[in-house]
UniProtKB/Swiss-Prot annotation:
Cystines in this chain: none
Pfam assignment, any one: Isochorismatase
Lineage: Eukaryota, Metazoa, Chordata, Craniata, Vertebrata
Protein name: Isochorismatase domain-containing protein 1
Family: Belongs to the isochorismatase family.
Organism: Xenopus laevis (African clawed frog)
Amino acid sequence: MAEKPVCTAQVNVSCVSQSNSCISIVGSNNSNSVPVLFCFSVFARPSSVPHGSGYEVLIQKFLSLYGDQIDMHRKFVVQLFAEEWGQYIDLPKGFIISERCKIRLVPLQIQLTTLGNLTPASTVFFCCDMQERFRPAIKYFGDIISVGQRLLQGARILGIPVIVTEQYPKGLGGTVQELDLTGVKLVLPKTKFSMVLPEVEAALAELPGVRSVVLFGVETHVCIQQTALDLIGRGVEVHIVADATSSRSMMDRMFALERLARNGIIITTSEAILLQLVADKDHPKFKEIQNLIKASAPESGLLSKV
Protein backbone atom coordinates (compact mmCIF):
# COMPACT_ATOMS: atom_id res chain seq x y z
CA MET A 1 0.00 0.00 0.00
CA ALA A 2 1.42 3.36 -1.03
CA GLU A 3 2.28 5.79 1.73
CA LYS A 4 -0.02 8.75 2.10
CA PRO A 5 1.55 11.95 0.72
CA VAL A 6 3.18 14.23 3.27
CA CYS A 7 0.70 16.97 2.57
CA THR A 8 -2.87 16.38 1.45
CA ALA A 9 -4.14 19.66 2.82
CA GLN A 10 -6.48 21.87 0.89
CA VAL A 11 -6.20 25.64 1.18
CA ASN A 12 -9.42 27.39 2.13
CA VAL A 13 -9.35 30.67 0.20
CA SER A 14 -13.07 31.40 0.19
CA CYS A 15 -12.63 34.73 1.97
CA VAL A 16 -9.14 35.83 0.91
CA SER A 17 -10.51 39.02 -0.61
CA GLN A 18 -12.08 40.02 2.71
CA SER A 19 -9.32 39.21 5.17
CA ASN A 20 -6.00 37.42 5.14
CA SER A 21 -6.82 36.01 8.58
CA CYS A 22 -9.50 33.79 6.99
CA ILE A 23 -6.92 31.55 5.35
CA SER A 24 -6.33 28.20 7.06
CA ILE A 25 -5.24 24.68 6.28
CA VAL A 26 -8.37 22.58 6.60
CA GLY A 27 -8.25 19.00 7.82
CA SER A 28 -9.70 16.54 10.26
CA ASN A 29 -6.77 16.30 12.68
CA ASN A 30 -8.05 17.58 16.02
CA SER A 31 -5.01 16.64 18.11
CA ASN A 32 -3.05 19.29 19.92
CA SER A 33 0.04 18.70 17.80
CA VAL A 34 0.29 18.75 14.01
CA PRO A 35 3.21 17.10 12.14
CA VAL A 36 4.94 19.45 9.72
CA LEU A 37 7.89 18.95 7.38
CA PHE A 38 10.04 22.10 7.54
CA CYS A 39 12.09 22.67 4.39
CA PHE A 40 14.88 25.21 4.00
CA SER A 41 17.44 25.33 1.18
CA VAL A 42 18.35 21.67 0.44
CA PHE A 43 17.26 20.48 3.91
CA ALA A 44 13.99 18.96 5.14
CA ARG A 45 13.33 18.22 8.82
CA PRO A 46 10.15 16.73 10.30
CA SER A 47 8.78 18.32 13.44
CA SER A 48 5.44 19.41 14.87
CA VAL A 49 3.62 22.55 15.98
CA PRO A 50 0.52 23.12 18.11
CA HIS A 51 -2.80 22.88 16.31
CA GLY A 52 -3.80 26.36 15.07
CA SER A 53 -0.24 27.66 14.80
CA GLY A 54 0.34 30.63 12.53
CA TYR A 55 3.14 32.53 10.85
CA GLU A 56 5.11 33.62 13.94
CA VAL A 57 5.17 30.10 15.42
CA LEU A 58 6.40 28.69 12.12
CA ILE A 59 9.16 31.28 11.84
CA GLN A 60 10.34 30.45 15.37
CA LYS A 61 10.28 26.75 14.51
CA PHE A 62 12.41 27.39 11.40
CA LEU A 63 14.88 29.30 13.58
CA SER A 64 15.03 26.50 16.16
CA LEU A 65 15.63 23.90 13.45
CA TYR A 66 18.07 25.77 11.22
CA GLY A 67 19.58 28.39 13.53
CA ASP A 68 22.57 30.21 12.08
CA GLN A 69 21.81 28.99 8.56
CA ILE A 70 19.05 31.63 8.35
CA ASP A 71 20.23 35.20 7.78
CA MET A 72 17.53 37.26 9.48
CA HIS A 73 18.73 40.40 7.69
CA ARG A 74 17.14 39.00 4.54
CA LYS A 75 13.49 38.90 3.59
CA PHE A 76 11.69 35.56 3.35
CA VAL A 77 8.40 34.12 2.18
CA VAL A 78 6.71 31.08 3.77
CA GLN A 79 5.17 28.65 1.28
CA LEU A 80 2.88 25.62 1.60
CA PHE A 81 3.01 22.59 -0.69
CA ALA A 82 -0.52 22.39 -2.14
CA GLU A 83 -1.45 18.93 -3.46
CA GLU A 84 -4.17 20.50 -5.61
CA TRP A 85 -1.56 22.41 -7.64
CA GLY A 86 1.39 20.07 -7.22
CA GLN A 87 3.66 22.92 -6.14
CA TYR A 88 4.39 25.42 -3.37
CA ILE A 89 2.15 28.45 -2.99
CA ASP A 90 2.66 31.61 -0.93
CA LEU A 91 0.74 32.02 2.30
CA PRO A 92 -0.01 35.28 4.11
CA LYS A 93 0.74 35.82 7.79
CA GLY A 94 -2.83 35.09 8.81
CA PHE A 95 -2.92 31.40 7.95
CA ILE A 96 -3.24 28.66 10.60
CA ILE A 97 -2.29 24.99 10.52
CA SER A 98 -4.73 22.22 11.36
CA GLU A 99 -3.42 19.27 9.31
CA ARG A 100 -0.03 17.76 8.59
CA CYS A 101 1.71 19.50 5.75
CA LYS A 102 4.98 20.50 4.15
CA ILE A 103 6.16 24.11 4.26
CA ARG A 104 9.32 25.86 3.22
CA LEU A 105 11.11 29.13 3.96
CA VAL A 106 12.36 30.83 0.81
CA PRO A 107 14.85 33.75 0.92
CA LEU A 108 14.13 36.50 -1.57
CA GLN A 109 17.03 37.01 -3.91
CA ILE A 110 19.39 39.96 -3.40
CA GLN A 111 21.34 41.06 -6.44
CA LEU A 112 24.98 41.13 -5.37
CA THR A 113 26.56 41.85 -8.73
CA THR A 114 26.03 45.53 -9.47
CA LEU A 115 27.11 48.02 -12.09
CA GLY A 116 28.22 50.42 -9.39
CA ASN A 117 26.49 53.50 -10.76
CA LEU A 118 26.23 56.41 -8.33
CA THR A 119 23.94 59.43 -8.24
CA PRO A 120 23.75 62.11 -5.52
CA ALA A 121 20.05 61.40 -4.95
CA SER A 122 20.64 57.71 -4.21
CA THR A 123 23.89 57.88 -2.21
CA VAL A 124 24.90 58.34 1.43
CA PHE A 125 28.46 58.78 2.73
CA PHE A 126 29.54 56.83 5.84
CA CYS A 127 32.58 58.18 7.73
CA CYS A 128 33.74 55.53 10.19
CA ASP A 129 35.65 56.23 13.42
CA MET A 130 38.22 58.79 12.22
CA GLN A 131 39.27 59.60 15.79
CA GLU A 132 42.26 61.26 17.40
CA ARG A 133 43.37 58.28 19.48
CA PHE A 134 43.82 56.20 16.33
CA ARG A 135 46.30 58.65 14.82
CA PRO A 136 49.54 57.04 16.12
CA ALA A 137 48.49 53.48 15.29
CA ILE A 138 46.81 53.62 11.87
CA LYS A 139 49.09 53.42 8.83
CA TYR A 140 49.01 56.58 6.66
CA PHE A 141 46.44 58.13 8.99
CA GLY A 142 47.26 61.69 7.93
CA ASP A 143 46.77 60.77 4.29
CA ILE A 144 43.38 59.14 4.76
CA ILE A 145 42.26 62.14 6.83
CA SER A 146 43.19 64.41 3.91
CA VAL A 147 41.19 62.27 1.49
CA GLY A 148 38.32 62.00 3.97
CA GLN A 149 38.10 65.79 4.14
CA ARG A 150 37.95 65.89 0.32
CA LEU A 151 35.01 63.47 0.42
CA LEU A 152 33.17 65.48 3.08
CA GLN A 153 33.61 68.66 1.02
CA GLY A 154 32.31 66.85 -2.05
CA ALA A 155 29.28 65.62 -0.11
CA ARG A 156 28.44 69.19 0.94
CA ILE A 157 28.81 70.48 -2.62
CA LEU A 158 26.54 67.76 -4.01
CA GLY A 159 24.03 67.70 -1.15
CA ILE A 160 24.79 64.11 -0.17
CA PRO A 161 23.87 63.05 3.40
CA VAL A 162 26.79 62.05 5.64
CA ILE A 163 26.62 59.74 8.65
CA VAL A 164 29.59 59.76 11.05
CA THR A 165 30.33 57.31 13.86
CA GLU A 166 32.83 57.42 16.72
CA GLN A 167 33.97 54.23 18.43
CA TYR A 168 33.69 54.63 22.23
CA PRO A 169 34.45 58.37 22.14
CA LYS A 170 34.62 58.55 25.94
CA GLY A 171 37.84 56.58 25.80
CA LEU A 172 39.06 57.12 22.23
CA GLY A 173 38.18 60.77 21.71
CA GLY A 174 36.09 62.44 19.04
CA THR A 175 36.53 62.83 15.30
CA VAL A 176 39.80 64.53 14.34
CA GLN A 177 39.65 68.31 13.96
CA GLU A 178 40.88 68.19 10.35
CA LEU A 179 37.53 66.74 9.30
CA ASP A 180 34.87 69.44 8.94
CA LEU A 181 31.58 67.86 10.02
CA THR A 182 29.48 70.91 9.17
CA GLY A 183 26.09 69.83 7.86
CA VAL A 184 26.45 66.07 8.47
CA LYS A 185 23.20 64.21 9.07
CA LEU A 186 24.30 62.25 12.16
CA VAL A 187 27.29 61.90 14.47
CA LEU A 188 26.79 58.81 16.61
CA PRO A 189 28.83 57.13 19.36
CA LYS A 190 29.06 53.36 19.20
CA THR A 191 30.59 50.32 20.84
CA LYS A 192 29.51 47.89 18.14
CA PHE A 193 32.08 47.55 15.36
CA SER A 194 29.54 47.89 12.55
CA MET A 195 28.13 51.33 11.78
CA VAL A 196 24.73 49.76 11.12
CA LEU A 197 23.16 50.87 14.39
CA PRO A 198 19.39 51.18 14.95
CA GLU A 199 19.72 54.96 14.58
CA VAL A 200 21.54 54.52 11.28
CA GLU A 201 18.91 52.11 9.98
CA ALA A 202 16.22 54.62 10.96
CA ALA A 203 18.09 57.39 9.14
CA LEU A 204 18.36 55.26 6.00
CA ALA A 205 14.65 54.48 6.20
CA GLU A 206 13.99 58.24 6.06
CA LEU A 207 15.89 58.32 2.73
CA PRO A 208 13.86 55.84 0.66
CA GLY A 209 15.72 56.56 -2.58
CA VAL A 210 19.10 55.51 -1.18
CA ARG A 211 20.63 52.43 -2.75
CA SER A 212 24.39 53.10 -2.36
CA VAL A 213 26.74 53.85 0.53
CA VAL A 214 30.22 55.32 0.07
CA LEU A 215 32.22 54.06 3.05
CA PHE A 216 35.58 55.24 4.40
CA GLY A 217 37.51 55.36 7.68
CA VAL A 218 39.12 52.84 10.03
CA GLU A 219 39.85 50.07 10.53
CA THR A 220 39.48 48.34 7.17
CA HIS A 221 39.43 44.79 8.58
CA VAL A 222 37.16 45.55 11.54
CA CYS A 223 34.58 48.35 11.47
CA ILE A 224 34.75 48.97 7.71
CA GLN A 225 34.45 45.27 6.90
CA GLN A 226 31.60 44.58 9.31
CA THR A 227 29.72 47.69 8.19
CA ALA A 228 30.08 46.75 4.53
CA LEU A 229 28.88 43.18 5.10
CA ASP A 230 25.90 44.37 7.14
CA LEU A 231 24.92 46.84 4.43
CA ILE A 232 25.23 44.46 1.51
CA GLY A 233 23.22 41.91 3.50
CA ARG A 234 20.42 44.48 3.53
CA GLY A 235 20.60 44.94 -0.22
CA VAL A 236 22.59 48.20 -0.15
CA GLU A 237 25.38 48.65 -2.71
CA VAL A 238 28.67 49.51 -0.98
CA HIS A 239 31.63 51.49 -2.35
CA ILE A 240 34.76 51.45 -0.16
CA VAL A 241 37.14 54.34 -0.78
CA ALA A 242 40.56 52.65 -0.77
CA ASP A 243 42.56 55.88 -0.45
CA ALA A 244 40.52 56.92 2.61
CA THR A 245 40.58 53.58 4.44
CA SER A 246 43.35 51.99 6.50
CA SER A 247 44.30 49.73 9.42
CA ARG A 248 47.13 49.29 11.89
CA SER A 249 48.33 46.34 9.81
CA MET A 250 48.65 46.50 6.04
CA MET A 251 48.19 42.74 5.86
CA ASP A 252 44.84 43.02 7.64
CA ARG A 253 43.84 45.82 5.29
CA MET A 254 44.84 43.92 2.16
CA PHE A 255 43.01 40.70 3.00
CA ALA A 256 39.90 42.58 4.15
CA LEU A 257 39.65 44.46 0.84
CA GLU A 258 40.17 41.23 -1.10
CA ARG A 259 37.44 39.48 0.85
CA LEU A 260 35.03 42.39 0.46
CA ALA A 261 35.62 42.60 -3.29
CA ARG A 262 34.81 38.89 -3.62
CA ASN A 263 31.49 39.58 -1.87
CA GLY A 264 30.39 42.14 -4.46
CA ILE A 265 31.60 45.27 -2.66
CA ILE A 266 33.15 47.90 -4.93
CA ILE A 267 36.70 49.04 -4.07
CA THR A 268 37.32 52.47 -5.55
CA THR A 269 39.02 55.86 -5.00
CA SER A 270 37.91 59.29 -3.88
CA GLU A 271 38.42 60.90 -7.29
CA ALA A 272 36.51 58.12 -9.04
CA ILE A 273 33.63 58.57 -6.59
CA LEU A 274 33.38 62.35 -6.98
CA LEU A 275 33.59 62.33 -10.77
CA GLN A 276 31.08 59.51 -11.01
CA LEU A 277 28.66 61.53 -8.90
CA VAL A 278 28.79 64.55 -11.23
CA ALA A 279 28.96 62.32 -14.34
CA ASP A 280 29.08 65.20 -16.84
CA LYS A 281 31.25 68.29 -17.27
CA ASP A 282 28.02 70.24 -17.77
CA HIS A 283 26.83 69.29 -14.29
CA PRO A 284 26.18 72.56 -12.39
CA LYS A 285 28.58 71.49 -9.63
CA PHE A 286 31.34 70.14 -11.88
CA LYS A 287 33.63 73.17 -11.54
CA GLU A 288 33.50 72.98 -7.74
CA ILE A 289 34.27 69.26 -7.80
CA GLN A 290 37.04 69.83 -10.35
CA ASN A 291 38.67 72.41 -8.09
CA LEU A 292 38.39 69.98 -5.20
CA ILE A 293 40.24 67.18 -6.99
CA LYS A 294 42.91 69.31 -8.67
CA ALA A 295 45.14 68.65 -5.69
CA SER A 296 46.03 65.00 -6.21
CA ALA A 297 45.34 62.51 -3.45
CA PRO A 298 48.46 61.63 -1.43
CA GLU A 299 50.70 58.89 -2.83
CA SER A 300 50.80 57.23 0.55
CA GLY A 301 51.90 53.70 -0.23
CA LEU A 302 48.40 52.34 0.28
CA LEU A 303 48.22 51.39 -3.40
CA SER A 304 50.79 48.63 -3.05
CA LYS A 305 48.80 47.17 -0.16
CA VAL A 306 45.35 47.03 -1.77
